[in-house]
Amino acid sequence: MSQQTTDNRTTAERLFRSEEELAGMPASERIRYRLVTANKRYHANDNISAFVHEGELAELKAEVQAKLQDVLQALVIDTHSDHNTNETAKRVAKMYIEEVFRGRYVPMPAVTEFPNAERLNELMIVGPITIRSACSH
């Protein structure tokens, strides 16, 4: 099938996948497929945890690790004999999935509410509180 023929298929035809076909796809594509078919946004700052099935986070981490290994190879870094880069792709993938974008892949925590016994009508700040975020730029 030519690229133009593929591009001209309807959205429904491009989106329909059998369970068998889905099972053979990388975790990122399965998750993206669920988001697209549910017509849900998946921008950089969106929480997509509802579309990540059990076990897929580990698969996603392995997929990211493989891509990062490719990046290191493209940068002409000897990751096999340079002890400084041993398992770098694995560590960086873990950092992105479990730390930098943690709020993306795990459900948001419940918000705790307290009664306003003092009837305050101003913002109360307790700190200092350090906040770190990944900018989508």
Regions found by a protein language model. Give the residues of each.
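Active-site loop/lid in soluble adenylation, ligation, and acyl-transfer enzymes
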Residues: Q4-H137
